[in-house]
């Protein structure tokens, strides 16, 4: 045993890398209230004031600065500080806060476009290296893409794919750095490498190469930390070191990679063990414990990546998805709520509301009531928290999983994900009606589909064609994803993050869908109303609708059952096709903010949505159609089965404060009851916004009045001022429930 482990109860974790066992043996469940919490220290105030000044300057400029000379890497940059005298946790991606990295490994053209957008130019040397000598992920992907994939991508059926940006959604077990130190982790990886024996064929050769890269990455992380004067070769000795060591593990990931989602994992309960030991030994006070957490969170709030304009259309508001998964319940029935669960959420008060880190509460009916009420209060005050159903994820992933990006569960350090963007199911329906021809470009996208020529659309005929399109697109989607992730592993491998995984990991292939509610409502309109297509040159470009129809979002099984059938069908079709590295097929109903861009690529649909108008986000009902109140809307979404959508079912829920009650305590209790009822039905995810539409309209027109206004959008939170006008208008047009 290491001397740094004195005071901890031993177990399997002392012999093998097993952070879960360490947590289960050592954490202390907290069932009390928030009364112990402390405000920010003077050091924290000074550091945060300087950070806010830089953030506001960045907001005006778009980005603050970029290093155009240095190629991204774990230890490529000199140390950077914000306020060296007052920083309790140190480390930035580059040599200065908010200075962004140029990462050419995903694609040199993308890096150059990103720089050009903000008035910067890549260095001649970097351009030369990645144009003439070093192939990139993007080049590899497009070398291998089939013509069918290129057509579907261009038409906006398969789009937003991680072929032009880092895939992300990989969570290193950064806790391992604090618990074991880098030297022990290197030693364990070397043992693994020596045991990787057998017939030297593709998979074994690749894995041996990857583990060798992981060992080098661990050494680079150690060197990077030493540049800040911190020795992470051995385990952390106290809470401050544990947070710092863990952060260096995460920092290596965001220095090396610019993945779409660079999530943190499940760290609050882990760090609480160190804080409790220090408090018991009189080494720190509660003020100092909160200071460590506040300053750790400040660092996470300042993570940035360089993005293309096209990327910003997909993922609006400059998100990084530093997702932290909080609470949940252990397999033994004890909740994983600790005082540190409160401290993390309390940063939303000490530092003000913010979109990052992406605070995610793993909700269970067995969480302490005091914690449920605290979470609800924080949601009402800050609109910064999302909730995910631990009771349906725990049986699949155990009690040491975390959320990647928005809604995607995986076991920390044991699973990784191949992120797959999404397929536009609303567009697929138009392809079914038009015989596989794109309604906007007039090009053939899906072969062997006859156009529907009836004067009034027949539900059974349309559904038959629609399912044929879904069958074809599922196969094409899997093939496309296989190419992308083969090339990402080859040309943009995440060595630092994968070094903090078990050597033999589970892999999840994360497919997604957009236009879910539009597709369901459109089929409902065809079935229950009379829908006549309007054609130009044989292509349906509009619809005339007679009569009404049931709309998804009103707890009406006539249409909700159609919605469920769609996801079940697409999930089943995906699973018929083999995946790269035998990854498990998963599916999400999640759009991020790409529902606006997808809408621009999608023609008029039978439900009455007009050409170019946004789709609804995630699994949400279409804007304004959930007329029966908040509970009916939630009930519809709760019917979408997690069993066929294990990558997540995203629901963004906005309610005006008065609908929850006229008194603060009443609002808290009502919100707890709403979430209890929703998750009790097996629903998966809920973004919670408690605010008035008028506030957002005023913020759009007077942004200076609301410099830190944070809202939940689709699986993440965003600073409202960072959204484009199109995205702001789309958010404002969503349903704000005025009654339960």
UniProtKB/Swiss-Prot annotation:
Keyword Acyltransferase applies: yes
Positions of the PFL domain: 1-610
Family matches, as Gene3D superfamilies: 3.20.70.20
Alphabetized GO MF terms: formate C-acetyltransferase activity
Pfam families: Gly_radical, PFL-like
Residue span, Glycine radical domain: 617-740
Subcellular location: Cytoplasm
Residues found modified as Glycine radical: 715
GO BP terms: glucose metabolic process
Predominant location: cytoplasm
Enzyme Commission designation: 2.3.1.54
Catalytic activity annotation: formate + acetyl-CoA = pyruvate + CoA
GO cellular component annotations of the record: cytosol
UniProt keyword terms in alphabetical order: Acyltransferase, Carbohydrate metabolism, Cytoplasm, Glucose metabolism, Organic radical, Transferase
Family: Belongs to the glycyl radical enzyme (GRE) family. PFL subfamily.
Additional comment: Several mechanisms have been proposed based on complexes formed with substrate analogs. After activation by the glycine radical, the cysteine radical, Cys-406, can abstract hydrogen atoms from the other active site cysteine, Cys-405, and from coenzyme A, and it can also transfer hydrogen atoms to product radicals. The other active site cysteine can attack the central carbonyl of pyruvate and covalently bind the product acetyl group.
Identification of the protein by name: Formate acetyltransferase
Organism, scientific name: Clostridium pasteurianum
Gene: pfl
